[in-house]
């Protein structure tokens, strides 16, 4: 597939500069980019103690990425349906990179009947009732819990990757990372060249580079419609 130019080999240094800006730039009164705290807020969402539970800290961290989680969804995910979320998270590996998922493993890990897809449907309220979580918010919750496996999808990075909707996003991301063109290695290089001390995943590196690139192109962030 054709990648956005910011992910091409010739622009590794430029992408690294964007990642550095995102994580280090201070705005008025010394306030950082709020999204720079998403990854490691309260120690991160994939640390052993909380890896299999959606916590209030996870949902607070998601709000740092400009997507407030509706109150009914918070109650559902943290309280009334927390056991279901935990059961699904227990079946989704914490130590697996999307780039390492083989073609034979894809359906088991991310296919329509996988625990990851079932968690996505739970987050969206697909099989019960809608509680206000759209695809962007769902992707950010999943990326908080499994940062190495699930990428963020939104109205900036999606179009840059040629995604018209969220239905096929995981397969598209997977194809880009496993086509042998060296994207995983470039993402590692981007993170290393960025000079940031925070150890973020390759997927988060890609997300930040794409998002910053899109914003500088003048792309606008649309609301996360619950549809």
Residue ranges and their predicted role:
Residues 1-129, 148-227:
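An N-terminal alpha-helical hairpin/helix-loop-helix interaction module that forms a charged
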């Amino acid at each position: 597939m054709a990648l956005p130019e910011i992910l091409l080999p010739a622009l590794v240094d430029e992408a690294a500069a964007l990642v550095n800006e995102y994580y280090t730039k201070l705005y008025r009164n010394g306030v950082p980019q709020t999204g720079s705290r998403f990854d490691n807020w309260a120690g991160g969402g994939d640390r052993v103690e909380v890896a299999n539970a959606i916590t209030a800290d996870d949902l607070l961290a998601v709000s740092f990425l400009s997507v407030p989680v509706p109150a009914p969804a918070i109650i559902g995910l943290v309280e009334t349906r927390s056991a279901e979320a935990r059961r699904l998270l227990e079946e989704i590996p914490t130590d697996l990179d999307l780039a390492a998922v083989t073609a034979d493993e894809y359906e088991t890990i991310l296919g329509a009947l996988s625990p990851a897809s079932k968690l996505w449907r739970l987050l969206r309220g697909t099989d019960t009732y809608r509680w206000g979580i759209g695809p962007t918010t769902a992707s950010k919750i999943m990326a908080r819990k499994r940062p190495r496996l699930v990428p963020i999808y939104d109205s900036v990075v999606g179009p840059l990757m040629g995604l018209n909707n969220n239905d096929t996003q995981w397969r598209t991301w997977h194809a880009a990372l496993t086509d042998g063109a060296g994207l995983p290695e470039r993402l590692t290089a981007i993170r290393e060249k960025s000079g940031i001390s925070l150890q973020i995943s390759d997927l988060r590196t890609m997300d930040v580079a794409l998002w910053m690139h899109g914003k500088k192109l003048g792309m606008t962030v649309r609301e996360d419609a619950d549809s």
